[in-house]
A protein has these predicted regions:
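Extended, acidic-biased charged interface segments
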Residues: 108-152
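A generic structural signal for short beta-strands and their flanking turns/coil linkers
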Residues: 59-63
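Acidic, proline/glycine-rich low-complexity IDRs
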Residues: 133-181
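Charge-rich, low-complexity N-terminal segments
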Residues: 1-57
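Generic structural hydrophobic/aromatic packing signal, biased to beta-strands
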Residues: 53, 79-82, 140
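An exposed acidic His-Trp-rich patch
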Residues: 64-127
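Generic low-complexity segments that are intrinsically disordered, proline-rich and/or Lys/Arg-biased
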Residues: 15, 21, 29, 40, ...
Length: 181
């Protein structure tokens, strides 16, 4: 609770990361998952902060994104879950029918300092689309004030490497013997 004022200030401050984000590294604990982790630049720091993204089974509709900072022991400041089990906000002041929150949802701290799952208005507009990384990740970035390369838009994101056309160098000049007049 002592850090809550600093936390609120940090959450309202723009945070920047490199763009585009390419989620391509194999996760050591889960070989079928891809991950990305990168530090954030922030004018008002809250410990060392970074962004972490995991895409399971290379499925853009099964991802989680986290805003992390070591100023909290749990490190998780904000988390977006696009798929998986419902989350239960097991608190007496939340009515039982409202305690279960299906995916997609965002975990964020409320005014009482509890990390709870919520569906934002943007998620509720189209929950199926918000489950995908192309729509869900910008929603996460908006909640966390995360931008790409000193811009005011969320960073571009892609899963896996873009395919490349192989280049094979040949030892002959295709223009050899052609007269250019």
């Amino acid at each position: 609770l002592l850090k809550f004022a600093s936390f609120k200030e940090f959450m309202q401050t723009p945070k920047y990361t490199s763009s585009p984000i390419i989620v391509k590294d194999k996760r050591p604990q889960h070989e079928t998952s891809l991950e990305y982790e990168n530090p954030l630049d922030c004018s008002i720091p809250f410990g060392n902060s970074y962004i972490s993204i995991e895409v399971k089974n290379s499925d853009e509709y099964n991802f989680s994104a986290k805003l992390m900072a070591d100023a909290f022991s749990s490190k998780v400041i904000l988390r977006y879950d696009s798929a998986g089990a419902s989350h239960r906000n097991n608190f007496d002041d939340i009515p039982l029918p409202d305690q279960q929150v299906t995916t997609p949802h965002i975990h964020k701290y409320d005014e009482k300092g509890r990390l709870i799952a919520v569906k934002t208005d943007e998620i509720l507009i189209d929950q199926e689309a918000a489950s995908g990384i192309k729509i869900g990740f910008p929603i996460f970035c908006k909640e966390g004030n995360i931008y790409g390369d000193l811009t005011t838009i969320s960073p571009k994101i892609q899963v896996g490497e873009q395919p490349t056309i192989p280049f094979e160098h040949i030892g002959i000049d295709p223009c050899e013997g052609v007269s250019f007049q």
